[in-house]
């Protein structure tokens, strides 16, 4: 039986005004912002650990963060670690104004002559529009692409994968952290129990959860990249078994180890 508290909260979230959502995100109430917003140092370390484990480096590299959230902290940290340039793409970002006090540690990264301070275009490019706009500028391709808990919110992942591939230089590396859980964390697999029509009409939040599984991401990225690998970061087999009989067949492979996965790192190159 479907949990009543889940259904009530999902419907409320579905129809919650965007202004209220933004307010709750800013204050960290009920709806949690992404790690780049609430813990940027941890986000930077997560990216760096993945890059270093792959034998790669940010030194002299042009890096794209797909869905940066609005804060520049991770971009600044990457530049501090030796990156040549950072491109930030997010059509839904809530930009955090950069004051002189915040800009000062960045040294020559900002032009602090006005308020808010503005990143120097030779070091940071900010695109508050879909990735296609960056591609339309015919700017330099990037060497590394990073994202954290972004792809599960994308409506057209196939299109996003194609555009990300187009933005990447030959030999470029992708590191995408993907959260496969229902974002109502008490019920990590509950969203998989509903038909597409019911989910889209009544339960899908304004931030969109596409409900794609590991095999979907593997298929979509393999269509545009020569190499794709998925590292499991977490799984919840007990929670999966509790709702296994209710999960719709299109979300199942029959392999519990794969079906119970909740968080992954997808690499593509």
Per-region residue spans from a language model:
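Conserved class I S-adenosyl-L-methionine
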Residues: 58-70, 173-199
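A short glycine-rich, Lys/Arg-flanked "PGG" loop and its adjoining helix->strand segment in the class I
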Residues: 158-173
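A short acidic, Gly/Pro-enriched loop at the edge of an enzyme's catalytic core
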Residues: 132-145
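Hydrophobic beta-strand segment of the Class I
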Residues: 145-146, 175
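A C-terminal cap/extension of S-adenosyl-L-methionine-dependent methyltransferases
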Residues: 126, 219, 228-269
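Class I SAM-dependent methyltransferase SAM/SAH-binding core
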Residues: 73-134
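Acceptor-substrate binding/catalytic loop of class I
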Residues: 197-216
């Amino acid at each position: 039986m479907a949990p009543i508290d889940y259904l009530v909260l999902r419907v409320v979230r579905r129809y919650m005004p965007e202004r209220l959502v933004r307010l709750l995100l800013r204050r960290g109430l009920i709806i949690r912002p992404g790690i780049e917003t609430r813990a940027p140092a941890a986000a930077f370390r997560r990216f760096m650990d993945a890059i270093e484990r792959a034998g790669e480096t940010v030194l002299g590299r042009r890096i794209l963060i797909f869905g940066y959230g609005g804060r520049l902290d991770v971009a600044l940290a990457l530049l501090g670690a030796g990156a040549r340039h950072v491109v930030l793409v997010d059509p839904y970002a809530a930009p955090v104004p950069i004051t002189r006090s915040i800009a000062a540690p960045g040294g020559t990264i900002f032009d602090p002559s006005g308020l808010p301070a503005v990143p120097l275009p030779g070091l940071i490019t900010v695109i508050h529009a879909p990735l296609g706009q960056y591609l339309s500028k015919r700017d330099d391709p990037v060497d590394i692409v990073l994202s954290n808990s972004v792809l599960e919110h994308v409506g057209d992942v196939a299109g996003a994968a194609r555009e990300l591939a187009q933005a990447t230089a030959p030999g470029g590396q992708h590191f995408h952290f993907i959260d496969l859980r229902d974002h109502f964390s008490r019920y990590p697999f509950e969203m998989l129990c509903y038909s597409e029509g019911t989910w889209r009409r009544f339960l899908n939040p304004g931030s969109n959860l596409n409900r794609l599984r590991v095999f979907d991401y593997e298929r979509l990225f393999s269509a545009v990249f020569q190499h794709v690998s998925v590292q499991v970061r977490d799984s919840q087999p007990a929670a999966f078994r509790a709702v296994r009989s209710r999960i719709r067949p299109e979300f199942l492979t029959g392999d519990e180890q794969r079906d119970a996965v909740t968080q992954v790192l997808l690499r593509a190159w």
